């Protein structure tokens, strides 16, 4: 089947198999930030933004993205660069959390801790738990608020 998908701002027109996963399509096109983890849509490593909404690309057929816009971390480096260091400073892994954090901050630039946890709930973190990510995002938001107030 023929599809047209805008990936990180670039239109890709291609013939694909109807059972091709979005994850495999994206990796074929150089989006290596999209990881294959559990393959059961439980871990969140494969999270991408489909028309701005986080989806698990290991459970989305490429055909579903036909006519839509997909963003991976490769296309959102500038937006992510503000807060990933804050997450890393907490010793927390960033696997899949970055895409959900971008979606959260676009929707709600001043989320509560419960709202942050709700957005991160789609990611399974066996390495560092969720508290490091929460602290990193909270520290980033505190930094941004201090900057806005001219205290940074």
Please name every model-derived segment.
Residues 1-152:
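Signature of N-terminal electron-transfer/Fe-S-associated modules in redox systems
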């Amino acid at each position: 089947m023929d599809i047209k998908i805008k990936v990180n701002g670039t239109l890709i027109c291609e013939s694909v198999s109807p059972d091709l996963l979005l994850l495999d399509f994206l990796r074929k096109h150089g989006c290596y930030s999209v990881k294959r983890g559990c393959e059961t849509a439980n871990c969140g490593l494969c999270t991408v933004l489909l028309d701005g909404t986080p989806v698990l690309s290991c459970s989305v057929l490429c055909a579903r993205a036909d006519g839509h816009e997909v963003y991976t971390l490769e296309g959102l480096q500038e937006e992510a660069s503000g807060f990933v260091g804050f997450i890393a400073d907490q010793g927390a892994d960033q696997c899949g959390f970055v895409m959900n954090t971008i979606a959260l901050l676009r929707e709600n630039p001043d989320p509560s801790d419960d709202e942050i946890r709700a957005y991160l709930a789609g990611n399974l973190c066996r390495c560092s738990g969720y508290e490091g990510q929460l602290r990193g995002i909270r520290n980033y938001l505190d930094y941004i608020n201090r900057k806005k107030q001219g205290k940074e």
